[in-house]
Amino acid sequence: MIDFQNRRAIVVDGHDAIMTYTTAEDLAAVVVRAVDLDGEWPMIGGISGDKLPISQILQIGEKLRGEACHIHSILGCSHGITGHPFTIDKVKLEDLENGNLTASWTLEASHPTVTGDQVDKMVKTVLIGTLIGSAKGAWNVSDEVNKLLPDFRFTQIEDFLAKIWHGKP
């Protein structure tokens, strides 16, 4: 779980899970093209955008969420930007599988018809499930449909995040 806004993440210790990021625009464009294809569609219809290990996504986040460097000579900052390290909580897969979340933070959610305890339990369950899923490869999407459209270029996660975070503190 990566929180770019607050420069922090929760990762499963010992697992550098592959994450697949596909923009809604790319998904729509692929579906439009695929509908017009001749022939038989594959039984499994994976559409896979950019695939990166979590460690690389965190590096991109640290780069994009950097801070202006004001003391170039002392810090050795030649590009005018310093990376801003993310705080990374590592949790054990065994703890997660036993329903224990040991991270220093969690997701936040609220709803006027749901009590705080119910929300907390639901958010914890979703976060644990997401982390277990990542460690077990659930976010490494297959690419059967990609192979039918070899000329299609998916949005790269770094380009997408750079656009989203440009000019934001």
Residue map of PLM features:
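Tryptophan-centric aromatic hotspots in well-structured domains and transmembrane helices
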Residues: Y21, T125-V126, F160
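Short coil/turn linker and secondary-structure boundary residues
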Residues: T22, L52, V91, V114, ...
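Amphipathic terminal alpha-helices
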Residues: S142-P169
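Surface-exposed beta-strand-to-loop junctions
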Residues: R7-I10, A138-S142
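Oxidoreductase cofactor-interface core, primarily capturing Rossmann-like NAD(P)-dependent enzymes
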Residues: M1-H70, I74-T87
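Short, surface-exposed beta-strand/loop "edge" segments at domain boundaries and coil↔beta transitions
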Residues: A17-I18, K136-A138
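Terminal hydrophobic/aromatic helix or amphipathic segment near a protein terminus
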Residues: L58-G137
